[in-house]
């Protein structure tokens, strides 16, 4: 009787161990993707997709796209790319900003949209992990309803955990120079993530991540500084009159966002400002404000991506888990999220003290996060200038302006650029390649 009981217990334990093994296999799934629906032929680069579980029970499943450098992946830098939002899929970076593929701009006719190769991919000289985060973004999901609500500071910890596990399974990249990069809202999360990785390198984690620095494009950094820069930017771009600008300066005294209710004069002029600018395309003021469904609209490609990413053959090729979220959306803006970092400037200071390099770039026609606000917070850090304001060139033409500081921070504008690198892909790529290779812009 006792033997039967022991035998029964052992069988139960074996079943449980088998289930745990399958669960771990499921959590840590990764697939090499040789071809993608919509792209003709084999992919001309190495693509891996997969999930890494984070959290106490690995309940949060973070989906990633990993593309190896086309030059020398054994030695080239490894970049982690975080798209803004929060809640915007990493596909935005991969297909529209710095990846080796993009959508072909054809009128949608009910068939699967096509993909084409790009010329100015950052993966020419760097390997990039494009990460869907926070949970609920892109193809990332939770296996239970019991998980902590994502937050800026919490994401820094989750991303660090993701990296530790990812590098544990890709140890060939553990010694590569590592950088965290992103744009827009990631201006709050990336500096915090860099600090978290740096802290982990000293306190807990072996082997340490070979962290070298970070890259940020048009980064949200400080809510007040960023918002207050919109009015001087609008004046400089001839979107408002001299008279309105002078009235705003006089009555608001530089505070255009959190205006006191009793300051009725300021509120009146702010309303006039809004009337002058509310029909401007915020992300690139030179482009028309148009409907997504219009094929000649700049953002029509986003609609095509939605059709592509929701196709069953695409999901199968990417090896998307069936228990993942249902419909894929490029940006899930209603994602439950706690915006608990109001300013990332203290993180920039700490990262500078730790000696990390940084590249901060701004498209100079972005109205969402104007370059003036970015210049203002960088200036407030009060680091000495070692290479003063000068043009940087592409093909003997001015591509933007740059300045380098003693804390290893390089600031650059991209002339004619918008909120993301997709508006000026050649200039953005050349800027990145020069900086990542340690060359002056």
Curated annotation (Swiss-Prot):
SUPFAM superfamilies: alpha/beta-Hydrolases. It comes from the Eukaryota. Pfam families: Peptidase_S10 (PF00450). Glycans are attached at residues 109, 350, 382. Residues 1-29 form the signal peptide. InterPro entries: AB_hydrolase_fold, Peptidase_S10. Expressed in seedlings and roots. GO terms for cellular component: extracellular region. This is Serine carboxypeptidase-like 1.
């Amino acid at each position: 009787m006792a033997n039967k009981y022991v035998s029964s217990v052992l069988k139960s334990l074996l079943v449980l161990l088998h289930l745990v093994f399958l669960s771990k296999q499921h959590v840590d799934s990764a697939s090499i993707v040789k071809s993608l629906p919509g792209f003709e032929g084999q992919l001309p680069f190495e693509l891996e997709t997969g999930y890494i579980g984070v959290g106490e029970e690995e309940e949060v499943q973070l989906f990633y796209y990993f593309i190896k450098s086309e030059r020398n992946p054994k030695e080239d830098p490894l970049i982690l790319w975080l798209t803004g939002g929060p809640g915007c899929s990493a596909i935005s970076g991969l297909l529209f900003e710095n990846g080796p593929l993009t959508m072909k701009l054809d009128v949608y006719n009910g068939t699967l949209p096509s993909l084409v190769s790009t010329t100015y991919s950052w993966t020419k000289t760097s390997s990039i992990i494009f990460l869907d985060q926070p949970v609920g973004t892109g193809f990332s999901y939770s296996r239970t309803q019991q998980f902590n609500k994502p937050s800026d500071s919490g994401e820094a910890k989750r991303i660090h955990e993701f990296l530790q596990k990812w590098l544990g399974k890709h140890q060939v990249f553990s010694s590569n120079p590592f950088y965290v990069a992103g744009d827009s809202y990631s201006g709050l999360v990336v500096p915090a993530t860099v600090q978290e990785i740096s802290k982990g390198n000293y306190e807990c984690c072996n082997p340490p991540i070979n962290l070298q620095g970070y890259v940020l494009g048009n980064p949200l950094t400080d809510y007040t500084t960023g918002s207050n820069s919109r009015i001087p930017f609008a004046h400089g771009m001839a979107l408002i009159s001299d008279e309105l600008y002078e009235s705003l300066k006089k009555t608001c005294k530089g505070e255009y966002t959190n205006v006191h209710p009793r300051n009725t004069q300021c509120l009146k002029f702010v309303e006039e400002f809004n009337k002058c600018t509310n029909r401007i395309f915020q992300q690139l003021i030179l482009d028309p404000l148009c409907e997504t469904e219009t094929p000649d609209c700049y953002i029509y490609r986003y609609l095509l991506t939605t059709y592509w990413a929701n196709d069953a053959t695409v999901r199968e090729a990417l090896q998307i888990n069936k228990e993942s979220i249902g419909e894929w959306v490029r940006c899930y803006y209603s994602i439950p999220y706690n915006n608990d970092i109001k300013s990332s400037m203290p993180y920039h200071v700490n990262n500078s003290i730790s000696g990390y390099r940084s590249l901060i770039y701004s498209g100079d026609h972005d109205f969402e996060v104007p370059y003036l606000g970015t210049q203002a917070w960088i200036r407030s850090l009060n680091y000495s200038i070692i290479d003063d304001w000068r043009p940087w060139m592409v093909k003997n033409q001015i591509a933007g302006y740059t300045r380098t500081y003693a804390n290893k921070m390089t600031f650059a504008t991209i002339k004619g650029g918008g909120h993301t690198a997709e508006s000026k892909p050649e200039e953005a790529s050349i800027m990145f390649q020069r900086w990542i290779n340690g060359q002056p812009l």
